[in-house]
């Protein structure tokens, strides 16, 4: 490493513990009584979903390291075993706060709002008992598969993340003497709604319960020859980290399909049970799943809080939700010109979800239909369930255009979807590429090659986020349309590199990982340090999802020690420490957790007054810089530069949704007393709506202008 004096374990935060702090920031939104009630419930659901993925991937990976006897320490000087111990302590605390928030704050508040939630079937009224028993007979009983365990029937395979009910049974006709206890389990069917609306005791109220409570109440109907001693829900989390040997795999698609099946049956790494579970039932689960100690979570409430999103979706409670924001039209496209003409007139900046994602979809759609378009090339990492972009690409191939699509099969938890899309695109006649061996392709780029009067012209869309029309309404991302030939040449080179083995001798504008992106960033950070040493103004501002690359962090420490002012917007993991005397006193870190998920990557360097701005798909993480194909691109249009600087400025001034990293390692919200409240996300919504409205008004006024049918001088003559 270049900056060895800054490469000490005490200067870094462990990646996993930093992630837990991020989930804690999400949880703090659920606890914020200034938020609408249903939004708080949504954030609580998100913390649960986040924690599931964290265990299936990150904790699973650490457990693999322990099993393999791996003793090497991480950048913070912790072994895998030490990390697991610290993770366990902090995640148990997190889960405790989750359920305290649910039981003590949200459930009573929901009751006041007219939504009664019954989490225990013992609380049903007689009328409700009658309803749920009939509901069980009509809708649930035919779907259930009770599974017993005895000498002829081994313990059943329990699928990852499924909710199950375990029961202890005793035969009804057992003679007096020692009671024989049997075990049985039944999976709560995921094909049925987990949140069930039942008759309410109060007029004007809605009452809901959970499917597992209906099953638990009626479980004796599944075991007619037995007495049910006890029945309790449980849930397991398995290792879902896919080990794929790409060098050995003859067909990557087939290999991933094989591994996906194994994901359901990986090692059990976490067991969630009701805190009142019968110890005898718990002992059976512990033995069968080989789970002990801290890997067992005793839950004071319903298991798997992701179901709160279903409660969020119940009709009639809009007054307890944030008003739904409709992405505004993009002013540049609010005219009757075709999309290619608009791009020829100048680069176009998009800021989602404040601006609509429609121009990106229309770009591919129009290219698919345009007889002058010869080729379309695109990278796809995560796409929506019914993707209009996939449909347009398929149509383009059917229309005889050359269509090349890189579908990243290794996009975690989207592998199955991407396999389906890859097969569909191939069937339509597209050239489908699965990426480079050993590297995930995470870059976001589309190239359209069009025949025009002056010859071939290349149109490029570059972005920080996925080509996913669904998440584009929920994630904050930036993108640019351009037909600058230098970008076009580089885009062609990227696709040639992905589809063949050709790497260009030089790149005009794009910075590509893993080739030289990290080196380029380090050089730009060093350049700021040199400016600072000469007494010139030196400033770095960067926005990303996560920061954990040790070389980049060491370079930032070096720049800070030279006097460079460094402002960082890091939504998630941050392994950098602020406030280390003489090292990171000039570094300020904030994290925005709001209604939209902050996802864009923006990098600003003062460069002695010749400002440079870059955007792209890469975070400052080893996986992005060393193990993925990523693209970062410069922003050269002065008008767009101003817009991006406004984005950064507003987010650095946010005092409503921003959490500030302290030297202690804790994140704290700003003291807002006596200050004008700035919620950057709300402000961007307002600005985008106003701009779209102004552009629409201008278009109407242009149409009203009287244009003589003949030149004025001809009329006078």
Label every model-predicted segment.
Residues 1-540, 558, 562, 574-717:
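N-terminal localization/anchoring segments of enzymes in phospholipid and broader phosphate metabolism
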Residues 548, 572:
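A generic "binding-loop/recognition-motif" signal
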Residues 550-553, 557:
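Glycine/threonine-rich ATP-lid/beta-loop region of ATP-binding domains
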